[in-house]
Amino acid sequence: MKIVVLERNSVGTDIPVDYSELGEVTYYENTVTIEEVAERIKDADIVVANKAPMREESLKDAPNVKLICEFATGFDNVDIAYCKSRGIRVANVVDYSTAMVAQHTFALAFYVSQKLRHYDDYVKGGAYAAQSRFSNFDVPFTELDGKTWGIIGMGNIGRRVARIAESFGCKVIFHSVTGHSKVTEYEQVDFDTLLAESDYLSLHCP
């Protein structure tokens, strides 16, 4: 069985991507164009990709392809209708980055709310060591506690962010992108209300 990994560099080097026990594996660091895909997968049985265009144009001359595995949750790079017509299965990684995206959301929130750039520069530039006072409040910073955190898109990531925001003492409100959210533990509001009432707003939608 021939396995082709089109975008090895789309995942970190700390993540093992060794499929040799499954078959003959060919690795490419990156694959961008339809022409590159077509040339590299023409003899493949399984293709592992991320953003490489898996379209009819790139798949039509690869008669042996039976499975496309995505290094991601999304699969908008894959022509699903064409794959169905060929009997090619498509697999993705569901919920692979929920915790990390939520973590990064709060890293950004802290960066903004605590004015970390300003105070980091202030200390590293020597201004803090040179001042005669102990504290510096030249640029005000704020707590998350007591603030309203608005969320657009209450899927897996949105719900994880909501739980973390709540643990910091935030009131959580959200707007459903589809209008059909079944989430009941947080207040659902219309878009204008979300914008008017939120101190912090995070988007977790396509």
What are these regions (language model features)?
Residues 1-44, 171-173:
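N-terminal glycine-/charge-rich "phosphate-binding" loop or analogous flexible N-terminal tail
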Residues 6, 50, 71, 202-206:
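Short, well-ordered coil/turn residues at beta-beta hairpins
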Residues 29, 71-72, 88-99, 176:
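Short beta->alpha connector loops at strand-helix junctions that form conserved
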Residues 44, 62-65, 197-198:
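An anion/phosphate-binding loop that grips the pyrophosphate of nucleotide cofactors and donors
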Residues 76-86:
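Rossmann-fold NAD(P)-binding glycine/threonine-rich loop
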Residues 94-148:
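Phosphate-binding beta-alpha-beta segment of Rossmann-like dinucleotide-binding domains, i.e.
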Residues 135-206:
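Rossmann-like dinucleotide/phosphate-binding beta-alpha-beta segment
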